[in-house]
């Protein structure tokens, strides 16, 4: 069994009260390592979450956007004053959430959740793309159904794009020739009853390629709504096959800022990178702050 080790016992990013768009929460960050720098794309919220009404109400409206920060060491980040991505289409009327970024053929694809706010199931997987990590374009729905927790694989398999997504409560895979039409949807992982991942599961960030398979970090939720991180290994040539899955979580809420926040008892990742034989896993804590935890590549053994 292996677990992640926190690089810091304090958040590496927290809300900035002077910035209207990120004054209440920063969490759930995608990460890309390019040009010897960590590029972090995080979800931010301008308001607290009121989720117990029959449907979303305008007086409680919270809008999510995507902020951008950059670092040379993976822990000390320079932040930008304005979001790099905001909602532009009706499906994004209440914002853009939980980004996951994959580089394919020198282009970056960000998949995220667009929340329309017309009812609580008005969330869709959406996509934008960029050539430089700064200018994003596209803003279109990937799957027109209530769905989230999606990312693309960094390589095509048998000439096809590969999508991971989450139809409740499982992790699914699908394929496409053009990033528009998706087919052969299939469950690859399901929750396990009477465990830390009994209620639902979903991928963290895009799987990371290793010599022995695709490393998939994912979140699991128990019946008390505690969010933890787990890990599995997918077959290199056929990522629909799970060849290993650790029984125990690799990270769970333990520190005060992971236990207490807008949504308590949550560690939730949208991205990890391999740098100098070390995996850096960025995670949202209690839907309020961002932390980072690491593990040496050689210690990841199933």
Curated annotation (Swiss-Prot):
Enzyme class (EC, first level): transferase
Taxonomic path: Bacteria, Bacillati, Bacillota, Clostridia, Thermoanaerobacterales
Subunit structure: Monomer.
Swiss-Prot/TrEMBL keywords: Carbohydrate metabolism, Glycosyltransferase, Transferase
Gene3D superfamilies: Glycosyl hydrolase domain, family 43
Species per Swiss-Prot/TrEMBL record: Thermoanaerobacter sp. (strain X514)
One example of a Gene Ontology biological process annotation: GDP-mannose biosynthetic process
A Pfam entry, by short name: Glyco_hydro_130
pH sensitivity of activity: Optimum pH is 6.0 for phosphorolytic activity. Optimum pH is 5.5 for the synthetic reaction.
Pathway connected to this protein: Nucleotide-sugar biosynthesis; GDP-alpha-D-mannose biosynthesis
Catalytic activity: beta-D-mannopyranosyl-(1->2)-D-mannopyranose + phosphate = alpha-D-mannose 1-phosphate + D-mannose
Name under which the protein is recorded: Beta-1,2-mannobiose phosphorylase
Annotated family: Belongs to the glycosyl hydrolase 130 family.
Known role: Probably involved in a salvage pathway for GDP-D-mannose biosynthesis. Catalyzes the reversible phosphorolysis of 1,2-beta-oligomannan. In phosphorolytic reactions, prefers beta-1,2-mannobiose (beta-1,2-Man2) as substrate. Produces alpha-D-mannose 1-phosphate, which is the precursor of GDP-D-mannose.
Known EC number: 2.4.1.339
GO molecular function, one term: glycosyltransferase activity
Record-linked SUPFAM superfamilies: Arabinanase/levansucrase/invertase
């Amino acid at each position: 069994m292996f677990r992640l080790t926190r690089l810091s016992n304090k958040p590496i990013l927290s809300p900035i009260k002077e910035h209207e768009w990120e004054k209440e929460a920063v969490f759930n960050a995608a990460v890309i390592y390019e040009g010897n720098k960590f590029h972090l794309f995080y979800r931010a919220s301008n308001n607290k979450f009121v989720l117990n009404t029959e449907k979303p109400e305008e007086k409680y409206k919270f809008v999510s956007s995507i902020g951008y920060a950059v670092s040379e060491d993976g822990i000390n980040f320079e932040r930008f004053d304005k979001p790099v991505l905001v909602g532009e289409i009706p499906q994004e009327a209440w914002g853009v959430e939980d980004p996951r970024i994959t580089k394919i053929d020198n282009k970056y694809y960000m998949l995220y959740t667009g929340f329309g706010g017309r009812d609580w199931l008005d969330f869709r997987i959406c996509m934008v793309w960029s050539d430089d990590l700064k200018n994003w374009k596209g803003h279109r729905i990937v799957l027109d159904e209530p769905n989230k927790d999606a990312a693309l694989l960094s390589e095509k398999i048998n000439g096809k794009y590969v999508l991971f997504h989450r139809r409740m409560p499982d992790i699914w895979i699908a394929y496409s020739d053009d990033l528009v039409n998706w087919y052969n949807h299939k469950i690859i992982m399901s929750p396990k009853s009477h465990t830390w991942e009994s209620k639902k599961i979903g991928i963290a960030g895009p799987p990371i390629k290793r010599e022995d398979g695709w490393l998939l970090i994912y979140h699991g939720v128990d019946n008390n709504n505690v969010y933890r991180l787990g890990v599995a290994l997918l077959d290199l040539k056929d990522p629909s096959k799970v060849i290993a899955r650790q029984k125990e979580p690799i990270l769970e809420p333990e520190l005060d800022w992971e236990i207490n926040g807008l949504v308590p008892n949550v560690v939730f990742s949208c991205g990890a990178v391999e740098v100098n034989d070390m995996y850096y896993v960025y995670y949202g804590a209690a839907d309020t702050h961002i932390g980072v935890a690491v593990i040496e590549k050689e210690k990841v053994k199933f």
